[in-house]
């Protein structure tokens, strides 16, 4: 039985995308094929192995003094979930089998189940890291007896990992579950290469044979340069048959930076007829772990 390596699971409100404000349990898997180390830095900065803040943290003695994941510092640049992607932080991860993961998830819900007595349902968000790197584990999770009242799943993915046949078959066998693909392709502001980050041929396969699924594209942007890239990317996705809503979300892993970009990005979204996604958890909680 395969175990899942994950950094955290928590109960909060969804802060981004289509389901903003919906009570949700988040399961953050470990590992990602990207580093996104340039978020918040100069766009033309040379790509390095680590984001500068992460590099300084790894090189310091601070990690010897930190025992728990939730005590790791929040960084101001790069990927805001850095501890879920860099191998240097493996020691803070949990490795649990499916029974343990299910028990952990349900313990976070108000009533110990996905569908509450009042008829409202709690959403499950598979996030990361890159959750599509754990496709061998997710079928175990969805097939577990205590997951059978789950009604809504969102998979937050960068849209670069091909869906496997076994995972697709399990999803197709559960039409009672509403599946939403929240695809967040990475633009050049992230520091990732276009040909590796923009993979429309991959995203186009996510809904095949899944009539009870939905999808949207969500781009992290800062300025008009990013918007020009969004236009280019959306055209490539459309040519591959991906027709879905497009969201713009402000760059900013901390309240100060987010607030500076929020209004400008909302204006850019309205000018293009695209949707605006806030990062409500930052406004509410300051982008702390477990939010």
Residue ranges and their predicted role:
Residues 129-131, 158-160, 186-188, 220-222, ...:
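Active-site beta-loop-alpha junctions enriched in small/polar residues
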Residues 104-121, 145-149, 205-215, 237-241, ...:
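A structural motif corresponding to the C-terminal end of an alpha-helix
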Residues 98-102, 198-203, 230-232, 259-263:
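Well-ordered, non-membrane alpha-helical segments in soluble/globular domains
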Residues 27, 36, 130, 155, ...:
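Conserved, mostly hydrophobic/aromatic
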Residues 20-24, 33-34:
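Conserved N-terminal beta1-alpha1 strand-loop-helix module at the mouth
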Residues 2-15, 21, 212, 223-291:
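Auxiliary Fe-S-binding modules of radical SAM enzymes
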Residues 4, 38-177:
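Conserved Radical SAM active-site core
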Residues 122-124, 138-221, 227-229, 242-244:
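Radical SAM/AdoMet-radical enzyme domain recognition
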